[in-house]
């Protein structure tokens, strides 16, 4: 039987639950640089990074952390080579297919953050399937930000506000609901950048 994170690191049991962050944001950075160090192509680094992230997610599942967000692909990442972008999209699809049974078993929910209009149809379909199958789960939340950027989200919110009926009341609650995640995802309490920067 596999040991839980709390069994492996018993000192964690001494930390009161309220001291743990509610929302952890992971920015998996440095995968392409790692691949270059081992004289390989960037996609090898991204695949290795995805494997490490799966281990991290399993570790976090044992802790009283409610929301984990992985910022997998920023809006400016479209500037990367076509081969790298296409490879990343395949990795995201494979990762979602792989994580779905665990989300269902743990009664956890999946939420995509970012645009869906520019990603490949096969990935959009997988994202929508995983979101739909987990939408009633209320244990923990896993978010993956794909084609996400703060400025882009702000621009999309402004467009949505402009399209509201003229007599609509605009307040902070309305603006929160127009954010990706429909206002359910608070700002991160802890940000981990895997490259260590």
Model-identified regions with their sequence ranges:
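Flexible, compositionally biased loop and terminal segments
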Residues: 1-197
């Amino acid at each position: 039987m596999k040991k839980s994170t709390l069994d492996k690191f018993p000192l964690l049991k001494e930390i009161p639950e309220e001291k743990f962050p509610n929302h952890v944001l992971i920015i998996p950075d440095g995968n392409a640089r790692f691949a270059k160090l081992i004289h390989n192509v960037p996609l090898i680094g991204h695949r290795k990074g995805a494997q490490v992230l799966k281990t991290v997610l399993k570790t976090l599942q044992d802790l009283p952390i409610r929301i984990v967000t992985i910022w997998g692909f920023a809006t400016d990442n479209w500037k990367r080579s076509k081969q790298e972008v296409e490879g990343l999209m395949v990795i995201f699809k494979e990762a979602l297919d792989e994580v779905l049974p665990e989300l269902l078993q743990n009664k956890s929910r999946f939420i995509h953050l970012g645009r869906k209009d520019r990603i490949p149809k096969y990935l959009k379909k997988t994202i929508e399937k995983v979101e739909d199958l987990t939408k009633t789960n209320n244990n923990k939340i896993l978010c993956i930000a794909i084609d996400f950027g703060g400025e882009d989200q702000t621009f999309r919110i402004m467009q949505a506000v402009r399209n509201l009926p003229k007599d609509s009341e605009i307040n902070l609650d309305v603006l929160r609901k127009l954010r990706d995640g429909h206002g359910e995802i608070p700002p991160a309490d802890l940000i981990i950048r895997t490259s260590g920067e």
